[in-house]
Amino acid sequence: MKYLAAYLLLTVGGKNSPSASDIESVLSTVGIESESERVEALIKELDGKDIDELIAAGNEKLATVPSGGAAAAAAPAAAGGAAPAAEEAAKEEAKEEEESDEDMGFGLFD
């Protein structure tokens, strides 16, 4: 993900076809070591492709993915009673909050 983010930053900045050294340079400015194999694989995959078209195609694919998280949470409540399901949901929310607070939002490129 960090390699793709660096690639996109370079393309938004006006570099139409970023090289491996460009991507590695962007990553090194924020203290991230890069793996040249992964950088080369990314460049190979994106070579000759329009970024805007790739983003549009990705958005279309994401739109078709069902997001049934709410339906799955409602099913145990209907089958097993509201009290245990509510207690379980509260535990899950507390656990998710702990996990999301661990990096304080600074783990963008980790």
Swiss-Prot record:
Swiss-Prot/TrEMBL keywords: Cytoplasm, Phosphoprotein, Ribonucleoprotein, Ribosomal protein
Location in or out of the cell: Cytoplasm
Entry GO MF terms: structural constituent of ribosome
CDD domains named among the record's database cross-references: Ribosomal_P2 (cd05833)
GO process annotations (BP): cytoplasmic translational elongation; transcription elongation by RNA polymerase I
Pfam family, one: Ribosomal_60s
Gene Ontology CC, one term: cytosol
Modified residues (Phosphoserine): 100
Main localization of the protein described in the UniProt heading: cytoplasm
Region (Disordered): 83-110
Biased amino acid composition, Acidic residues: 95-104
Subunit field text: Component of the large ribosomal subunit (LSU). Mature yeast ribosomes consist of a small (40S) and a large (60S) subunit. The 40S small subunit contains 1 molecule of ribosomal RNA (18S rRNA) and at least 33 different proteins. The large 60S subunit contains 3 rRNA molecules (25S, 5.8S and 5S rRNA) and at least 46 different proteins. The acidic ribosomal P-proteins form the stalk structure of the 60S subunit. They are organized as a pentameric complex in which uL10/P0 interacts with 2 heterodimers of P1 and P2 proteins.
Known function: Component of the ribosome, a large ribonucleoprotein complex responsible for the synthesis of proteins in the cell. The small ribosomal subunit (SSU) binds messenger RNAs (mRNAs) and translates the encoded message by selecting cognate aminoacyl-transfer RNA (tRNA) molecules. The large subunit (LSU) contains the ribosomal catalytic site termed the peptidyl transferase center (PTC), which catalyzes the formation of peptide bonds, thereby polymerizing the amino acids delivered by tRNAs into a polypeptide chain.
Note: Yeasts contain 4 individual small ribosomal A proteins (RPA) which can be classified into two couples of similar but not identical sequences. Each couple is distinctly related to one of the two A proteins present in multicellular organisms.
UniProt record similarity statement: Belongs to the eukaryotic ribosomal protein P1/P2 family.
Name the UniProt record assigns to this protein: Large ribosomal subunit protein P2C
